[in-house]
Structures are given as C-alpha cells and as structure tokens.
C-alpha cells in the first residue's frame, strides 16, 4: 500500500515511467526533447517558431522541420476503434417484475418526471442509457483509446453522486495499485483556496468486502505531505462521509486497462516506446536538407572577369555606383577569347539529402508499431488512382485492422467491467437495477456505402441468420432506442397476419375473397368448365 509522505514527478516516474516524455513526443514538442535540435536552436542555425516565437528567428531563415509520425501511430487505432463502437444494450428484456420494483431511488437515477415513476418501463435499459448520457460516452471513445495507447494505460472509475451515475476516465499517472493486488489508490493533485493538496481515493478489499476512503494531504514547497484531519477534509471536499463499505464486493470498482501488458511491464507500455530515436533522425535529416536547400537552392550566375568588369563600368556610368548592376545588361553578353560567357548555376534540389533514408525510417516505425503503410497514404507516387473494392481496401489495411481488433476487444471488456461496477453501485441503493455486463453493439471499422450496409444486413435477415431487430439496429446505427422500437413495431404490423383459415388453405387471393365469382357474380369455375 502506498505511503503518501511525498508526491512529485519522481513518484510518478517510479510507477509509470516517463509518460510525460511520450506526451511531448506525440504533441510535437521535439525541439525541447531532442538534443541535436536544442543545440542547433541555441546556436541560431535553426528555429522553432511554434515553441519559441518569431523573436528568436529574426536572423534565422531555416525552421526546425518536424514530420511527426509519432502523432499518427496512436491516432490510427483510435480512429478505427472509436468509430466501431455502437450503442450499449442490456442483456435482459423488460419484465413486469422489474417494473414493479421501480421506486423513488430509481427515479433519482433516471431523468424522468418525478410524479410518475411507473412510466419507466425498461428499467435496466433506462439506467444504462442514463450512464451513457451522464458520462458523455459517445464523445469519450476516441480520447480514451488515444490516451491508452500514448500513456500505456487508462483508468476508469464509476461514480454515484449529485452529478448522477456516470463513468469517469483518468490518465494513467493517477493510478497506484497495492502490492497485494487487493486495492488501489487514485492520487489527484488539486488546489483549494490557492493551496495545493493531494487528494487520495483508496479502494481496498478486506475480508471479502470493499472498503473505500477519501484522504487529503497538504503539500508544502518541497512536495512533502501532511495529512489533513477528517473534519477539515470533509469540509474542504464537501463530503458528509469519507469512508464506505460495500458488503460482498470482492474487487475494486476502479478498472485499469494496460496496453501490451507483459510480466516485465504489468501496467503496460506506450505505443511510442523505442520510436524516439527514429523520429529524431527523421526530423534531423529533413532539417539538414532544409539548411542545404536554403544555402544552395537559389540559382547563381557565373560570369568571366571581363564581363564583370564591363557590368561594373556600365553601372558606374549609369548610377555612379559600380555595385548597382542592372540585370538588363545580362540579357545580352559577349564571349571571351576562350568562348566563355555567362552561366546560370543551380543545384539539383532532388539530389539534396537522403529522402529515401527518411522513407525507410518511417516504414520501419510503421512496421514496429503494427501500422499499415496504406492507412497513412504514404507511398502514393506508384499507386493507381482507380477505385478499389472493399476487399482490396481490407488487405491494404490488414495490419492496422488486426491491431485495432485486439484493441477493440480489450476496450469492450474495459467498458463492460466499468458499467458493471456502475450498476453495482446503483444496485447497492436500488434493487430494481440488475447487475450485468451489457452488450456493446459494433459497427464496421472501414466505412462502407449505405447501399452495401443495407444489402449485407438484409441478406443476413432473409437467410435467417439475423433477427429483424438486429437488422434494423445495424441498418440504422445512429438511431435512438425509441426510434428502433417504433420502427420494429411498424415493420411487424405491416407483415401479413396469419389466421387458422389461411394456415390451412393458404393466403386468400382477391378471387377467393369474392367467392370465386367474377364481377357480375357468375361462378368462375363453371365458366371455365363450359369453355
């Protein structure tokens, strides 16, 4: 169990490594972390206007060039996975027994009219929907996955307070697990009345029950702590109780999601680990090329001494200054005795630097991080501009999709465990809420046309491998639950109804309905026999 006698950057680094370094790497603050860049900036050979402003660059023309591939590496799986997360549905169907248990506590959890709590029909789904609304979950998926990839881990915490039942997501550096594996501390640095405090939230399993506790420490200038008394802690944090016990809960509510967990790195590692050296070399090569181009890229004119003397003489006669050479005098010139005349010299900029070396480094970074080259549209000069089929696109993105599917399955498990913890909190106060791991619907990672989507799902429905409700949900992934239920009812109502007569003799035609008689009332069968 952590002993909070001091809290500073070293405490964070001891548990989580140098996560702030990887954040700077992602944000493109390379001129602050790479030694070669800092040295050139200090010498004045290059500048970084974004980091240091234009006042440092008034005598420098070459910028520090950053091709930030470290930004794409975590963003690509975040983009693929986040767009594939659909609605969250309960595994239970609404039943009368659960509806009868609705009470004022249920009404407090769900945003419904206060005077008619019985209007809540599907309690379980309403509670899950309320958790999503309170958590703004639809807006959190991309950031959650990105932060987990970047830091190497993500923390999820369920809360039930005056803000409602919700999920909160925290960066890795607040998470401090206990050595015995039976608890966890979350440490937040907060400021109250211009005074810095360390707020520690502890969850610990004792004899099969979960004990939670809030602690507050005063931080001095040397970052050492002094525990604040309980009465003052309640006042500063605005809480009536600092400790709670949840009988029967044998594991913490807090859920931690590591990235690429191993025995050597049980809390996970950043996806950018080991990529900083190659990123530095890419920036260095591009910046060195820029310096070379700045010095040698502009065209220069080479002329003989005789021509230069003639130009200076004309400038002296015309302007009184031999240095004011008129460019019009260069349009017509003469040859010297050796046939030499004016020459225009310009370096071939395509030969400057090692662009192929940069491409190889980028390719190596993508390979090590399991990122498809095509997903960043990198090698475009030799590719065809014709349209590709969905299968071709799939194989172009194959490596990234494999990585994204693994992240997707882990993220779904992470969300299910978090929602189960939130439902556990709700059930503790209200038995009408059932504890479960809900179903999370998935959408395609690769965008497909509306036509392809409908054809795929309709085919599954007609071949009886998919239900009507699932078909409607997948055809309308952004529709609300109310709309889906109404659409399902409309489709069911429009189906041809069956009765005992139709089941025995088949569905009636218009002629059968008219008693097998024509519009004049004559029997159709007799007329056919006469003929």
Residue ranges and their predicted role:
Residues 145-151, 155-269:
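Extended, regular secondary-structure scaffolds
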Residues 1-183, 520-531:
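Extended, helix-rich architectural segments
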Residues 152-159, 466-474:
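Amphipathic alpha-helical protein-protein interaction segments
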Residues 477-485:
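Short, basic interhelical loop/turn and adjoining N-cap
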Residues 487-531:
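Extended, compositionally biased alpha-helical segments that mediate assembly or anchoring
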Residues 235-392:
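Extended, charged amphipathic alpha-helical segments
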Residues 449-473:
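C-terminal structured domain segments
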